[in-house]
Amino acid sequence: MRREILVAAAILLDSRGRVLLVGNDWGRRGRVRYTLPGGTVEPGETAVEALVREVREETGLRVRSVEHLAYVIQVEDRRKNERTLAMAFRATYEGLLNPRDPDGHIVEARFFTLEEVEERLKG
């Protein structure tokens, strides 16, 4: 039976139009992978509840409102017999960046220009 994974992420912009990314180090010998803040929807959670929780954990910011669904992508990994459905929501926030990821994977959270985002997401 295929494992179904649901992921929710936030697209957060600062007052200068820069995009918030978090740097993840999942034990890859110091190699940091940048993503939108977000994560797996846990049993009993809605996608929006997961997004709010993950943004708080990974960045210290509080989601003020979730405005709309910006995009959805589905990825299948036949080797692992998994299908991941990832959703990114445009949201607004308040507070200051203060990452406190309980899993210990977030090594950085900061806003990037669109050019910097493109460079960070290549890897």
Predicted regions and their residues:
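Residue-level preference for beta-strand/loop junctions
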Residues: 4, 32, 83-85
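Conserved N-terminal beta-strand and adjoining loop/helix that marks the start
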Residues: 1-20, 37-40, 71, 90
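Short active-site-proximal "capping" loops at secondary-structure junctions
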Residues: 26-27, 71-75
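Generic structural signal for beta-strand residues in well-ordered domains
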Residues: 3, 12, 27, 99-102
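Conserved Nudix-box catalytic region and its N-terminal flanking loop in Nudix hydrolases
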Residues: 18-57
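Short glycine/serine/proline-enriched coil/turn segments at secondary-structure junctions
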Residues: 2, 28-29, 79-80
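Unchanged
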Residues: 41-65, 73-123
